[in-house]
Design a protein with these regions (language model features):
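N-terminal cationic and glycine-rich segments that engage phosphates or anionic surfaces
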Residues: 1-101, 105-445
């Protein structure tokens, strides 16, 4: 393993990509600590504790703690993800967007531009809602003998400044994510979410150590939780790496005096082709009711309806699990096109033994992919709702439960594996050993 890490720094391009990625991630974390103007940080810190186990607390997890601090990056990358989901859903039903999806690189550029415009619109809406929420009467706390508001000077000036600050922050974080994807290593959006989640881990560990010392929680309970975490990590790795191999045979072709083809290969169908995207997509959808509620902070009806979407309610987790199953199939259909694979195989003389080339091949691949995706999506949903089971069975808060299963753990493990696979690809291209499997090509020294 040490040799593999040393190999990274022997490849100039890979070294530059990693350093570039780390630099931009540091910029993201700095932005997550710069507060928007007009906020009393001390009062905010006291007032936000009441929302730790609600959807606000979960949103804060995705924003890397920036939401609870009301910083420039308080909205995180979620408006961008929501805009992406809307455009991809529109691509399934509206001919114009379907046409853009088929236009290759030019269509992709147009969709990216539309996603950016959508992100700005979503950010303006959410930032207005947050400004109303911060100015609401419930966002106050007792400091000493005084009940103080989070916003000392509410009004149109604060609303405009909040909208400008949060919109600028979201556009910047979106741009940083795109730069990481293009010029760094890994998926920029996923890495930004992952680094925000990891940022909260030290506080959780310190809190648990304090609880054990104060005998609030027994050491046996902590050992069980740690054991569960390792078991779940193992299953998540198996889920991410597991695949079904479909054998493919290429017919021999004679071109001039040369013989081409004749070799056997396979199509790897991953159990979880969609990766962590279904979780991120499902979570962003679950945040929509929360966003709507910020527009009506004083409405008892809206706030009462929001109680059903609390992370402590089973309704929230049932809907969340079903959304994960749906988005697993939805994103798999986008990421893997059986018709395109079958056409390419037919074009180059490839076929699946016992299956006729063309339409029959695409139907066969689609059938196998559907069967493989089903258990993967169900397991993904189960791991995502596991924190609710922990909260009920072991009486722990969501912050802790999320690190021993659920969204946080799935994103951390999934993004880490995806990034390692990209690093491994760079190493193998230059004949160095990879991280994830033994027996790779040796470096030529």
């Amino acid at each position: 393993m040490r040799q593999q890490f040393q190999s990274i720094f022997k490849i100039p391009e890979l070294r530059k990509r990693i350093l570039y990625t780390l630099t931009l991630l540091i910029v993201v974390r700095i932005g997550a600590h710069i507060p928007i103007p007009g906020i009393d940080s001390e009062v905010l810190g006291a007032a936000i504790r009441n929302y730790a186990n609600t959807l606000f607390g979960l949103y804060d997890l995705f924003a890397g703690g920036a939401f609870s601090r009301a910083t420039l990056f308080a909205l995180g990358i979620m408006p961008y993800i929501t805009a992406s989901i809307i455009l991809q859903l529109l691509g399934s039903v509206i001919p114009y967007f379907q046409k853009l999806q088929r236009e290759g690189e030019e269509g992709r550029k147009k969709l990216t531009q539309l996603t950016r415009y959508g992100t700005v619109i979503m950010t303006l809406m959410q930032s207005f809602g947050i400004s109303q929420f911060l100015m609401s009467p419930q966002m106050s706390a007792r400091i000493g003998n005084q009940l103080l508001p989070v916003v000392p000077n509410p009004g149109i000036g604060f609303v405009m400044m909040t909208m400008l600050s949060l919109t600028t922050g979201t556009i910047l974080i979106m741009w940083l994510g795109e730069r990481i994807t293009e010029r760094g290593i890994g998926n920029g959006i996923s890495l930004i979410i992952m680094i925000g989640i990891i940022d909260r881990l030290p506080n959780v560990v310190v809190s648990e150590i304090a609880m054990v010392r104060e005998e609030v929680r027994g050491i046996f309970t902590e050992i069980v939780l740690i054991g569960l975490m390792f078991i779940i990590v193992g299953f998540v790795v198996l889920l991410t790496q597991g695949q079904r191999k479909i054998p493919v045979q290429y017919a021999k072709r004679v071109v001039g005096r040369k013989v081409y083809g004749g070799q056997a290969t396979h199509i790897p169908l991953r159990v979880n082709t969609a990766g962590v995207m279904p979780i991120i997509f499902a979570q962003s959808i679950m945040f929509i009711p929360n966003t709507i509620s910020t527009f009506f902070p004083n409405s008892n009806l809206i706030q009462g309806m929001m109680s059903f979407f609390s992370v402590s309610q089973p309704v929230y987790w049932i809907i969340f699990g079903l959304l994960i199953v749906f988005f697993t199939y939805f994103y798999t259909a986008i990421a893997f096109n059986p018709v395109e694979v079958a056409d390419n195989m037919k074009k180059y003389g490839g076929f699946i033994p016992g299956i006729r080339p063309g339409k029959k091949t695409s139907e066969f691949i689609d059938n196998i992919l559907t069967k493989v995706t089903l258990p993967g999506s169900i397991f993904l949903a189960f791991i995502a709702v596991f924190p609710y089971i922990l909260m009920k069975v072991m009486d722990i808060n969501y912050d802790l439960a999320s690190f021993f299963g659920g969204t946080s753990l799935l994103i951390i493990v999934g993004v880490a594996l995806d990034t390692l696979q990209q690093i491994e690809s760079h190493l193998l291209m230059r004949h160095y050993d990879g991280f994830l499997k033994s027996g790779k090509l040796r470096g030529r020294h």
